[in-house]
Every structure is written in C-alpha cells, then in structure tokens.
Amino acid sequence: MSLSRRTFLGSALAVSTLAATSTPAGAASPPGDVVGKITVGYQGWFAARGDNSPLNGWWHWSDNWGEPPSPTNHALQSWPDMTDYPTKYPTAFGALGNGQPATVFSNHDYQTVDVHFRWMREYGCDTAALQRFNPTGGEGPIRDAVTAHVRRAAEAHGVKFYIMYDVTNWTTMQSEIKADWTNKMRAYTSSPMYARQNGKPVVCVWGFGFNDPGRPFTPQQCQDVVDWFKGQGVYLIGGVPTHWRREVEDSRPDFGGVYRSFHMLSPWMVGRIGNVADSDHFHTNVNTPDQAECDRLGIDYQPCVLPGDLARRHRAHGDFMWRQFYNMVRLGAQGIYISMFDEYNEANQIAKTPETQAGIPVGSGFLALDEDGTRCSSDYYLRLTGDGGRMLKGQLALTAVRPTKPVLTDTPPVERDLAAGRPTTQSSQTQHYGSHLAVDADPNTYWESANGVFPQWIGVDLGAVAAPRRMVLSLPPNPAWGRRTQTIAVEASADGSAFTTVSPATGHVFDPATGNTVTLALPAGLSARHVRLRFSGNTGWPAGQLARWQVWG
C-alpha cells in the first residue's frame, strides 16, 4: 500500500535560492480537456476476494488484504454508499444501521467503473485522472485491468481521461516510468476519450520534489523524466508540493527548475486546509502568488479543491468546498483538480456517501454526511462539483454563496421498521423465548420454537396495510452462535387468516463473521398487514430461531 498523501510536513525549511529555470512552456493555454475543465482524481484501487482479480484480496479495503474488512482490520476513514452498485462483496463488519449487510465494491468489476463514470457524466466531471502507482510489482496486473475498464467506461459515457503517475515509493521510477508509458500506457492515447490539451495527449506525474522518504529522487532524475515525456509530445502536468514556488516546508530545495518545466502545475492541498478561513488564507498567501508566477512563465495552473475530510468533520455541509471553488475561480485558475473522486481511505471522496447512520456499519465509528446536523443527499458533493464546474466555465455567476442545496427535497426518507414493537404470534416457543423478543430491538434476546418439530412459524401484525420492501433477520451477534443455515419462507396476509407465500422456502446462511444477519428482498408491490416467517429447517439447532426481525417499508 502506498504512503498516504495526507501527511503535512510542518517543519519549515530554510528558503533556498531557486534553481535556474528551464525555458517557459509558452503562453497560458486555451480551453481544452484540462484547461477550463473539472478534473477528478480517480484512484480505482479497490478489490475484493471473489472478484476474480489477480490479487484475490481486499485491496485498499483492509490493512491485511488477506482478510475481509472489519472493525479491527480496515484501511478506511469513510464508508461508501453501495446503493447503485450491481455487484457487492460482504465484509466482516456488522450490519448497517438500516439492518442491511455491510458490503463493498471492486474496481476489478467493470460494472463498478461504469457506475463511477456514469456519475461523472451525470454530475459534470469533465475529465478523470487515473492514478497509476508503481505498475511493476504485484499490483501491476490489476492496475492494467482497471485502466482497460476506465477506457471502456470513458468511451461509453463521454468522459475524458488521462494517466496520472504517482511515483510514491517507486524507487526505480526513472527508467521504469518511461518503459511503462512506451510499452503500455501510450496505446490508450488512441482512444477518442483520452484527454488532450493544446493538441497533445495529457500525462501527469505526481510526487516530484516532495520532502519525504517515499519520494527520494534527485532534481536531476526528475528533470530527466520531465524532459523525456515532453520529448514524447505530451502535455505534462506536475503534481507538486504545496510550497513548490518557495521550495520550503513540504518541498525539497533545488527543485525550482523541475517545477517550472511542466506545462501545468497542480499543487497538493490535502491535509493543508480544513475550514473556510484556511482556504481564504491560502488564497491570499499561496494561491495568488502561485497564479502570478505561473502567469509570468506561461504555465497553466490547476489548484486542488477538496470536499474536506469527513472523518475530521471538515466539510461544513459543503461550505468548505464551495469557498475553495469561489477562491480558485476568482483567482483565474486555468483548471481545477478535485481531490479526490473515490478516496474513502482519507475521507476526501466526492463519490456517493451515506446520508445518515442508516447506511453506516453499526459501531464502526464512520461518519455520515449529516455529521454536523445538516441533511445532505448521498450525491451532494457530486452535485456541488458540478456547480463548481459551471462557475469555472462562466455558466454560473461568480458567487461566494453556495447555490447547491444539500438535499433536493425537504421530505426526509420515510422508510422505517414496520415491525418494531408490534404484536407477534407464533406456532410455539421453548421455555421463556417468546416471539415478542424478535421485535424488541435487543440483539441478544431471541425467539425459539419448540425443538425437534418442523415447520414452525412466527408472525407480526404491522398495525395497518403497508408496503414492506425487505426484511432483515438476525441471530445474536455472539460468536457462540455458530454459522448455520435456516430454511425460511415468507407469507403475507391482509386480514391475518388467509396467508399467501410471497417468498418460497430458501436456505439463508447466518454467520457470526458477517453479523449473523440476513436480508430478504420482498416482491415489488407487496401489500400486507400481517407477515409471517415459516421455518422448515435449521442446521445449527432443531428449532426456528430469530433474535431481531425488522420489516422495512
């Protein structure tokens, strides 16, 4: 796993004398696929066991990729909203707040990348910068596969893309980055959706000059790579330290010539600002002189805009991000780089994120978008990015007042647990384990039928005819309740006497590793007041057993 980009190297270095600059790149560029556009940084680096990827592991979901993500083994600062993904992988987290299982996606599935690029098109993200870390090791094959998915999805949805090399911990970068471009990545420039600027294919190299052990390269090594790429006829972007111009703090000295030989500069900002006042301070003291220096040299300037670290409560329901858009547009920046599209590892993602704790694993500690008390739709930061892009392009008047509403309707979600605390019935019970214990919200109390006789059933009166959409069934989360399969059918009735089977008898696996929880989807259009579960088998104990029964609708 790569070194995090988050780290802010706060110890200031003495200001060095700027190295001699190379020939300026020429006049600032006209609009193209990065100038005048919103570019989103796309990691595309998640995988899951069972996705048929070369890694066959939980890439970037877990610290230990061999084990599923769990409360004690994960690499996340934020949780994804999984609603739109067609393929989902169960984790070892407990159920979500709404009772559904906690699942994640894999970028090795084309459908995942297709969902992401569909969002980009729908919400006005013009261009995606696909991050490409050292491709020569064990991660190379899956990165190659994801790159092919990105091209296919970009072409399907009309979104531009380019390769963005990240040289973090790539010690043999100087020769290998050239070989990778020549032998593999250059072929992608034949795509009609490969980004071009000034008639040249776009490439970014991120990480030259950073003052940390993960990027130990000399100015000479970096200048060689810059000159080589420019010799290949590309438009070259430099992902550079925040303080590139003065070569202090997060920048090594003697890199001034390297920085000033790129066609475009995109200084990193994650970990540097966390509120509106920080954004204003950087606008005055860093971004404004940066822009002036780039204008003087004919270099395009692409500052970062970030939604804010959700885990650190930086977002201020969009005000933090909008202030950055306002500051960068009034500055006259040539383009904007969103950091990042899908960075759930650092909680800086604009991709869909749960609105409330209903979409977060219970007890995980992850925050939802309503963490400051303001409801925000799961797509809010995608919509905010779209509006920021319109302001950049002059389609929306420059304004310091955020025009994007956190929600598109004032009506909150109405889905609720229809069975909570409702009257229950049963075919039988053992000792004091009555059916009422299945709807009492206590995960450790449970109903158990008479032993040794099947079928058995448990029913609940919803109080009125309703439209239940799904059921969430649980056994106690204690590991002592070992894995078992219960065969269950679902029956429904309007009057409590004539029941119809709406879901046939099916074996459902209850496993402590996944919270001992099962979700049953109900037929669309179902209308009922009384619902019943009919148990006809249990591999773990000769009885029907149920600790929590939620009926959502």
Identify the residue ranges that each predicted region occupies:
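N-terminal secretory signal peptides and thylakoid transit peptides that target proteins
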Residues: 1-15
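Aromatic, loop-rich ligand-recognition surfaces of beta-strand-rich domains
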Residues: 433-436, 440-501, 514-553
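Flexible, active-site-proximal loop/turn residues at the rims of small-molecule/cofactor binding pockets
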Residues: 14, 134, 271, 342, ...
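Glycan-processing catalytic domains of CAZymes
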Residues: 28-413
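Predominantly extracellular/luminal regions of secreted and cell-surface proteins
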Residues: 414-440
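Hydrophobic h-region of N-terminal signal peptides that target proteins for export
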Residues: 16-21
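Sec-dependent signal peptide cleavage junction
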Residues: 23-27
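Solvent-exposed serine/threonine-rich low-complexity stretches and specific carbohydrate-binding patches
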Residues: 502-510
